Amino acid sequence: LWRGAKNRDWLRSIPGRFGGLPFRVTAPGGIWLHAVSVGEVISAATLLRAMRERLPDTPLYVSVTTTTGHALALEKLTGLCDGVFYTPLDFCFAVRRILRAMRPSLVLIMETEIWPNLWRETKRSGAGLLVVNARISDRALPRYVKMRWFFAPILAIPDAIHAQSAQDVERYAQLGAPRERLHLGRNLKYDFHPERIQTSPEVAEWVRGHAPAHVVIAASTMPGVDATDGDEDDLTLAAFEAMGLEGLLWIHVPRRPERFDVAAAKLTARGIRFVRRSQLESLTLPGVLLLDTLGELSGLFPLAHAVFMGGTLVRRGGHNVLEPAFFGKPVIAGPYMENFAEIAREFTAAGALLRIAGAAELAPRLRALLADAGGSGELARGLAESKRGATEIACRAAIEILEANWPRQRRPLFQYLLLKPLSLLWAWGARRKQNVVPERLAVPVICVGGLAMGGSGKTPTVLHLAEYFRRIGRTPGILTRGYRRVSPAPYALIAAGDPAPVSETGDEAQIFVRAGIAHLGIGGDRVDVGRRLLAKWPVDVVLLDDGYQHRRLHRDFDLLLLDAQDPLSGGSVFPLGRLREPAEGLRRANAIVLTRVQRGREYRRLLAYIEKQKPGMPVYRSRVVPGEWMPSARPEGKAAAFCGLGNPASFWATLRLMGIETCYRWAFGDHHQYRPAELARLKHHALEAGATVLLTTEKDWMNLPPEAEKILQPLTIRWLRIGIEIEAEEALLAQIRQQMKIQYRTN
């Protein structure tokens, strides 16, 4: 509270530090990457970019500890990840709150972030745990060794630890980490890409306008640990005064935002001419540009002729010298580089980093560097580029662990104790239902269903099969329950191509009506409705929609759909989880289709689980294919999106696949019936975000009130038609034909 009183950003971060998320997670199975502050956020950008290329459909979330890191992450990572949030305090309740909301398949920790409760709760949730860019500094090692008894069991928790250097591997082993889980992963900071860094056009123009003869950057200056240490702002500004060079532009960059005003006061007290980056004005050289903004230091390195790296003249352990090195700039550092000891040793030995023993040497060494025309800078660039490769190693490790894990649903103890008996009762009832004697229809029946409540792609799969049967000359019929229909009639029969109101069909069945490719029977008693369907039309194959647990109707082929991102829906039967029956029910299937598969994923653990349950089970994969926008093409402009689906993340992923970045989005509950007041609020938020177009799904379009378009004006609303594609589809169709003895024929 005291810290929050002094720093409003910290005060606003408190809900997040106790497990609150600033966004809604709509799909499990993503990756949570934890970075501490500014330096780790910059390294995370390269890693996230590589992971997004390999796993374009997998949700990526980033947590940070500091307010400055949070601000930079929002600025730099928004297009690379699906959400930025504050790392929870290492209390079990706060960590569990995040894990229950997010349900990641992998938690990826960067550098030396050893949080016992976060690590333990991650593994208890079913997620994998990977530590990358791991290091233990010279200064921290003695303290850690004294507490080996504490660290050894914690370091046994991660699935793998990828250390920056061979020395770090040995240090982790010394602390008790299992040897078989330790790997040499290199340093992510070497994978910095200077070509991706842009200098602020405003600053670049300002510098060009002043035509400095020399540009020196004092980067990430720090106060001392105590009074005997000194203050790098004082020490470096004294060096600036001592240099006395005509045309010198000194760019002064305090490490922390709270030091901006302190540095300005010191400049004023010394009588040094300066301007602040936030208030660019004309400056007579020699003078100082005080960088009082975040995230712009990297973009200034190309302008420099020499760089002093802060945190090295006082006992702070130093900062990363790799960024200026990649730009080919000569770098000076003081004696304190414990945080980057190996980098400092390698660069110093190669002549790529100039070390000074104290502040008195800074001014003369800078003078010498400015006369050197970049010799040590080119050495630094060459050495830094030779050390690349950590990102590729980290990506491979992350994907391997991601493939080996999927999230479990862990409820609070009081919920578990309350719901477990009800879950057992539900499971008993589900098993009992399997004992009924099924009744046959006069034609083959294909069931398309799932184990869990909620969406798994059943509707588009049924339509896909109906189109296939019509294409080969069959007359398909569809049987469906008609969820959320409000008609008092016990059933409805609708001919292919005929219209029917949503009140008579329900929203999902209305999609079948509008497709117009199959006769449709709607009702709870699907045996009775099926017979009525056959009596009315010459249907010769029936598709049973969402009927895997409807055992009264005999089926000739059971096609089970499993959502690849949450195949067992938390692993528990309703109401403890979302399973309609115990997971072993998948053994009844003739074939399984993994729906919503993500590009770059192999799902090895899921395939192994299915093989264990029923050896030889045929498994296929499907993904959503976006169709056309209705009722006409999507107009240009910023888009907002909303939906009410069992798995809203599938819609967001489809939009991303189409290259549509939404400025605002909101997920409602499955089968949501929209009220005018909700649409008015939706319009307000979308317009506030700058949207001109509102995007939704076909199912949601049907659940809008008649006056929706009028309420949403001036926004233009469009809904998306979707289909699916099935890998090895012909093999699946051949299996269905063989099982049902349907011979292929055309009209």
Map each language-model feature to its residues.
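Catalytic binding pocket for nucleotide-activated donors in carbohydrate/polymer assembly enzymes
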Residues: 158, 302-382
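Active-site and donor-binding regions of nucleotide-sugar-utilizing enzymes
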Residues: 2-197, 218, 222, 228, ...
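Walker A (P-loop) phosphate-binding motif
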Residues: 28-34, 431-497, 599
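A transmembrane-helix-recognition feature enriched in membrane-embedded lipid enzymes
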Residues: 1-15, 146, 409-444
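Acidic donor-binding loop of glycosyltransferase active sites
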Residues: 102-106, 285-316
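C-terminal alpha-helical cap of glycosyltransferases
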Residues: 386-409, 730-745
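Conserved catalytic-core segment of nucleotide-activated headgroup transferases in glycan assembly
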Residues: 39-55, 194-279
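Phosphate/Mg2+-binding loops and adjacent switch elements
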Residues: 100, 482-614
